[in-house]
Amino acid sequence: MVSRAAAIFDLDRTLLDGASWPIYHQALVQEGVVSAGGGPALGIVFGLFRGLGESFLSMQATRLAAGRTRGWSLAAVDAAAVAALPELLAEVHPYALVLMEEHRQRGDLLVLATTTPYRLAGPLAQALGFDACLATRYGEVEGAFDGTIEGPFVWNRGKLNAVQSWASANNVSLAASSAYSDSFFDAPLLEAVAHPTAVNPDPRLALLAVLRGWPLRWLDKPAGVVKLAGRELQELTRPLLNPALLPNARFHFEGLEHLPSEGGYILCANHRSYFDPTAIALLLAKAGRTCRFLGKKEVFDAPVVGTLARVLGGIRVDRGTGSDEPLAAAAQALATGDVVAIMPQGTIPRGMAFFEPTLKGRLGAARLAGLTGAAVVPVGLWGTERVWPRSARLPHFDVARPPAVRVIVGEALQVLGRSASRDTETIMAAITALLPAEARQPHQPTDDELRATFPPGYHGELRSRS
């Protein structure tokens, strides 16, 4: 018989945003199993766990705490486990669900491996569609816990032993399996599988992962995004996204009141320059929002810029394949409350097309809006090409006479989703309406103006409309 692969997930700080125990504790209180007790001290303990992860002493205390469960009614514990489900499910990281589905599609078995008592963790594992739940089992007698632990304490090497026993009994090869955990104490399990991943790692696991070359992930963010001290790079660098720190441009922002303060939406802007992403980043920094930018594959394939784009959570688009993967990734980002930024033109127009009064867009933004129901916020950019024209390898840096750059935000649109073509026309018309009057008038450009719309070293036809 051919062995199968499994994807093994830890629970606290891996699948969940924090610890499950505060939620279970409240449910146990409501069912009359335990008293409210604990007060501020308990909150401090849970807060430390959420930020730094588990410690040897805290886990030994957890092991000993099994003795205090003697006499707990199994029926009441089961009721508490079910009562806790809605709050627990709300704490599951959005990209954890995406990752689990990817493993399902590959035919992997899904396994939840946690120190949490089986009576509590089992219903959650079932609700999430896990194939197995490997959790600490407390001894039972006459409808109550008896204060003992039966089998392994599912932590550290005890977790590895539980996984190995289950794998052997179910014809699963750990040499083909994956494991995800936040804890340094799960290193034995991570070392035993083919594909270990440190998720939201505690400091020691983060160091170990770097030394071993294991991937690092945060399941509240898209794959590739890196977090430091609980914050992603976009958030950490936001104070640096200040127009005053860019003396080669004079920025004018208008319509900031049209930017939603929360929830996902699609930001659509026209494309005139390599400087456009900077202008949009400054705009969203003013709004305090995190953004997922759709960009062409050439950006993501570049040695340094590509790495930065992935770390910032950008979405790679390979227009040659026609794949819907970028659309699905953008839809997931919107569902988690992020802003998705798209330039529907797809690229900076060249030649005469750059000066056309009517903007032409691709269908992706309209399709995304129709698929998700997300609002579209149009943004007009003007003057960015004077800072960094397509013909220049680097931006101009004229601090004596910096060009004016206008960033104008319009009212949100709610497209109908019936026709991607018509919705695209609506979006592009809304962007055009935000631009200065001169943008909507026919213009006969000079050869120098045309040359600025082509890449460096271009020697072909200047008056092309492509």
Residue ranges and their predicted role:
Residues L124-V141, S261-T321:
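Catalytic core of membrane glycerolipid acyltransferases/transacylases, capturing the structured
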Residues A5-F9, L110, S177, G263-A269, ...:
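Generic beta-sheet signal
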Residues V2-R4, A79-A80, P86-P239, P243:
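C-terminal cap/substrate-recognition subdomain and adjoining C-terminal extension
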